[in-house]
Each structure stands twice: as structure tokens, then as C-alpha cells.
Swiss-Prot record:
Role description: NDH-1 shuttles electrons from NADH, via FMN and iron-sulfur (Fe-S) centers, to quinones in the respiratory chain. The immediate electron acceptor for the enzyme in this species is believed to be ubiquinone. Couples the redox reaction to proton translocation (for every two electrons transferred, four hydrogen ions are translocated across the cytoplasmic membrane), and thus conserves the redox energy in a proton gradient.
The name this protein goes by in its record: NADH-quinone oxidoreductase subunit K
Assembly information from the UniProt record: NDH-1 is composed of 13 different subunits. Subunits NuoA, H, J, K, L, M, N constitute the membrane sector of the complex.
Entry's Gene Ontology BP terms: ATP synthesis coupled electron transport
E.C. number: 7.1.1.-
UniProt xrefs under NCBIfam families: PRK05715.1-1, PRK05715.1-2
Class of the enzyme per the UniProt entry, highest EC level: translocase
Coiled coil location: none
GO MF term set: NADH:ubiquinone reductase (non-electrogenic) activity; quinone binding
Gene name of the record: nuoK
InterPro entries, sorted: NADH_UbQ_OxRdtase_chain4L/K (IPR001133), NUOK/Mnh_C1-like (IPR039428)
UniProt entry tagged with the keyword Transferase: no
Main subcellular localisation: membrane
Source lineage: Bacteria, Pseudomonadati, Pseudomonadota, Gammaproteobacteria, Enterobacterales
Amino acid sequence: MIPLTHGLILAAILFVLGLTGLVIRRNLLFMLIGLEIMINASALAFVVAGSYWGQTDGQVMYILAISLAAAEASIGLALLLQLHRRRQNLNIDSVSEMRG
């Protein structure tokens, strides 16, 4: 069995990597990938904590987090597809410009 600290450290490292990808990248697709990594890191923390205390709540929260990530990915990818059709660019700087 993996100790609680090792699992939580791994989850924290994954969360920081996802947050770094979200903050540094300017492409919306890579920002969406960073957000997915952050959601999976929090789900990993739920599973590790539930395993440590012998509760099934961690697995239930993992299923909830995975369904949330799937819904977020499907909506996000649909929006990215429409944005790419209209602008031919997924750069966040060019998308945030207002036309008037």
C-alpha cells in the first residue's frame, strides 16, 4: 500500500504541473489539457485519502470527478471547435480581442 504522504505529494505535483500549463500556455487546447490534469490530480488525492482511511468515499468522489472531467472536456472541445472554425486560431490573446 502506498503511504498517504507519497500519494498526496504525487497529487500535488500533478496539480502544480496542470496549473503551470494553464498559466503559461497561450493555446486554449493546452489550457484545457492543463485543467484536465488538475481535475485528475484532485481525483487522485480523493482516492489516496479514501484508501488511507479505509473508506469508499474516495472512489465515489473519483467517479464524480471523472464524470465532471468528461462533461468539461466535451463542452470545452465543442467550444474550441467552434472557435477554430470562426477564427482559425486558438491563441488566447487573439480570442480576447474585441471587435466593434
